[in-house]
């Protein structure tokens, strides 16, 4: 069952709506959003609230729900 989420690009304030599967990894969400904004996915991380998300976690492991908003921010550790 698809989960409909919003990803917000904190750098410019724009958002996209995405459908993800419970088995999709956070890294997959970053890749899709970065491709949409023509950015290097390795330079960004996602936050859910105040929590930084790990790329290897799945949507179900982070309890992602329909209408959740994730923030895509520059990787505080510098990215690739």
Map each language-model feature to its residues.
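Ubiquitin system architectures
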Residues: 1-80
């Amino acid at each position: 069952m698809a989960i409909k989420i919003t990803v917000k690009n904190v750098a410019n304030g724009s958002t996209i709506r995405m459908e993800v599967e419970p088995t999709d990894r956070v890294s997959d969400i970053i890749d899709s959003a970065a491709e949409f904004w023509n950015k290097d996915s390795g330079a960004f991380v996602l936050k859910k609230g105040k929590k930084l998300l790990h790329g290897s976690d799945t949507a179900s492991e982070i309890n992602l729900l329909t209408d959740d908003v994730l923030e895509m921010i520059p990787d505080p550790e510098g990215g690739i």
